[in-house]
Amino acid sequence: MVFVYKPVKKQPHRDKPQGRKVEVVKQGDRYVLLRNGEPYFIKGGAGYEHYGRLSKYGGNSIRVWHTDNAQQVLDSAQKYGLTVTLGLWMAREREGFNYYDKELVAQQTEHLKEIVLKYKDHPALLMWGVGNELYAESSNVKVWDAVNQVAQMIKEVDPDHPTTTTVMNVPEKEVSLIVKKCPALDVLSINAFGSMHNLPEDLARSDWKGPYIISEFGARGYWEAFYTWWMAPIEQTSSEKAEFARQRYEQSVLADLKHCLGSYVFMWGNKQEVTPTWFSLMSEQGEETALVSEMRRFWGDTVVINQPPYIAYLKLDNKFAFDQIYLRPEQNFEATVFAYDPEQDSLQLHWEVLPEAARQDGNADKQKKPAVVQQTLLKQDGNRQWLRTPAKEGPYRLYVYIRDGQNNLATANVPFYVTHNPLK
């Protein structure tokens, strides 16, 4: 394999902005992130859109995973007074990269050096994210030597911005290797969802004793969810996600201010990952779910917020998702959603049936929402919807989207399996 990259175009010197000095210091028994000498606690969102809203709601930072469109991202962040943790994408071995190949690793480091030199003086830059969950599906410990090589390179060409790398939860072996092999890293970033509430204790038992950032959190991950018998993960309602994330934010971020430098909620925007709603804090049209309201409160927004609708539960054929819903093809069934609006706003319900997504891979960018299955929806009456199951056997989901006319949205879905031979 040959690592090929395009030379990075340098900014004209006359347009070169003035950067900001960012550093991590220890004050007494507490780690503090300083930006131009002032304490800077990260109140962020991970994503590529709605930066103006994030700033308006009290957020101060965004996180992205790679440098595609980095100039646009940094400029947009600067426009709204936000900072950026800018990801430097490092290839993974499962993608064919070999970290035993010293020449290949050197090429990658040189490529990343060009990127660092291009963006290091941008005033919106907060820190560098060196790779993302690099150990996933790989056991080659040489990857951490490469991470340290990149981090050390950054310290030489850009001493004004800290470096971090990202792991999922607190994998004991990998964290130990990071401590031993990556002394040039300043901060550990952790993507945590279901186990986020245990982070302070897990980190205390690990070899990492320095500062950390929660680089992704939000709904329970689909890899942590309960599954149907046909291996479809059961998704929380948007109301459940907000409460789930609120509890974990309080139990980790707010409970460990001596080590935690802040967090990035995931996903600030909309993303198809298993479903179009699993991690999306907003709809494709920008309507906001309950987790946005929770983050506004944590970020200190004092504006009185019109709350999104609340979904208590969704049933299909009088069954919950946990009841393993098998339905015969081309038969009529009834679905019911139980919901209310805190301000008693009038609610509009939209239903749709989608086939189960073929991929359950968060690392696959730009996944497309499956096409809506046509001719499945029959009569709707208030909170009830009748549907006709598809003729084709296989896994599907019934979705409901509830709007209050105030740019708020509540979502829920229930997986079901169409078959001529139901198991129950």
Please name every model-derived segment.
Residues V418-K424:
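Extracellular interdomain linker/stem segments of modular secreted and single-pass surface proteins
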Residues N383-L387:
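Short strand-edge motifs at loop-to-beta-strand transitions and within beta-strands
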Residues M1-K21:
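Bacterial Sec-dependent signal peptides at the C-terminal "C-region" and cleavage site
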Residues R388-K392:
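Residue-level recognition of secondary-structure-to-loop junctions
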Residues E23, Q27, R35-P39, G44, ...:
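Substrate-binding clefts and catalytic carboxylate motifs of secreted carbohydrate-active enzymes
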Residues N169, K173-W223, Y227-W230:
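Aromatic- and acid-rich polysaccharide-binding/catalytic face
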